[in-house]
Amino acid sequence: MYHGMNPSNGDGFLEQQQQQQPQSPQRLLAVILWFQLALCFGPAQLTGGFDDLQACADPGIPENGFRTPSGGVFFEGSVARFHCQDGFKLKGATKRLCLKHFNGTLGWIPSDSSICVQEDCRIPQIEDAEIHNKTYRHGEKLIITCHEGFKIRYPDLHNMVSLCRDDGTWNNLPICQGCLRPLASSNGYVNISEFQTSFPVGTVIYYRCFPGFKLDGSAYLECLHNLIWSSSPPRCLALEVCPLPPMVSHGDFVCHPRPCERYNHGTVVEFYCDPGYSLTSDYKYITCQYGEWFPSYQVYCIKSEQTWPSTHETLLTTWKIVAFTATSVLLVLLLVILARMFQTKFKAHFPPRGPPRSSSSDPDFVVVDGVPVMLPSYDEAVSGGLSALGPGYMASVGQGCPLPVDDQSPPAYPGSGDTDTGPGESETCDSVSGSPELLQSLYSPPRCQESTHPASDNPDTIASTAEEVASTSPGVDIADEIPLMEEDP
């Protein structure tokens, strides 16, 4: 009838034909069975034998669904299974079993019939959105709210509603959309995740290029409220790379910034020479500008006339000089202090001796056993000595030889009867006046007045007189020859 075509479910005529087709063989089988029984038991039992056969009643087919098997006689042990069409779900048991009850009759277990009810629409999975209701039935509208920075967009711009269909599906399902992922340059990178496809309003991204490439365009892009970027994505253009810098004999170069894998635009090279060599020019830098080195000149290192010590050696030499100078100064100060201490101790044991002071008013003293002893001045010593000699002696002071005036005694040695002074007497006078031993006799203990005795009686009279003359002579420094204290014998 349908010429090999599969009719749709729910066709009443087809279901009726399906129910009638399986029943004919079963009835034919029942008739054959009845005739066999009639042959065995006789014609008297033909009527009651067919009526004794028992079967379960037809369980029926649920609306908007179907059953397997769809028709026939359900004897004891038969099973009926139930299914629903799309958009519906089964409410009840999926299968029923024909069994005999305790009273001996047959029935379906479970006894409740299964039905097909309309299915609810499932909650859709929408990224960057929040769905308010948890269940939606046929004909209900979908209610969602997009996250901050995202806006709702429908496939059908003329229909801004999404409804739940009777088959449990949604029509015109919306999405929450932001700015779409911008293109990235193959020679650069952007600060976004590779899995992120949509960006909320206000998002700012930036682009960077790999070394050797220059950014052409805006480095920063912002997602605007109309869900487009503030500008087109930039490009990374290749820069012209400078060749290898010129080589320097007895030197080398370093580049800034380091390391220099490629001499890109803006790279700076600094030249330097080996120890003992120096650059011929004060300028030691060249810069890569659009594939060329600027300034373009050859760098040379020449041998230095004077080799300057290294910084370490210079510091070491400086510290040596400072240490030597400080040590010398400390040593000189120590020697000065020791000399001063020695001079102080020497003066305490040996008072200084020198010419008499010009001023007679300044007193001199020495310290003897911790007790200061006043010394006579030069004038006092001279006046005291002259007063002790007497008036007769003063007349002969101006002459070269001091002789007593009152006493004209003969000489102390025989054969000398001449009263005149000879050459020998003059020499004796000079030797006596210059002898330092005569000065010591001035401070010897006083003796008895022997001036009245004649000079011839005592040979020491001449020496004593000479001593007195020497004490009055201005050419003799009495103060230097006077002992400060008497030494023990």
From Swiss-Prot:
Signal peptide stretch: 1-40
Gene name per UniProt = SUSD4
User: Residue ranges, Extracellular compartment?
Assistant: 41-318
Q: Where are the transmembrane segments?
A: 319-339
| PANTHER family per UniProt | SUSHI DOMAIN-CONTAINING PROTEIN 4
- What ranges does the record list as Acidic residues composition bias? 478-489
Source taxonomy: Eukaryota, Metazoa, Chordata, Craniata, Vertebrata
User: Which UniProt keywords are present, listed alphabetically?
Assistant: Disulfide bond, Glycoprotein, Membrane, Repeat, Signal, Sushi, Transmembrane, Transmembrane helix
Extract the Gene3D superfamilies matched here: Complement Module, domain 1 (2.10.70.10)
Cytoplasmic topological domain ranges are 340-489
Q: Where is this region: Disordered?
A: 1-20, 400-489
Q: To which species is this protein native?
A: Pongo abelii
- Quote the InterPro entries the UniProt record gives: SUSD4 (IPR042985), Sushi/SCR/CCP_sf (IPR035976), Sushi_SCR_CCP_dom (IPR000436)
What's the protein called, per UniProt?
Sushi domain-containing protein 4
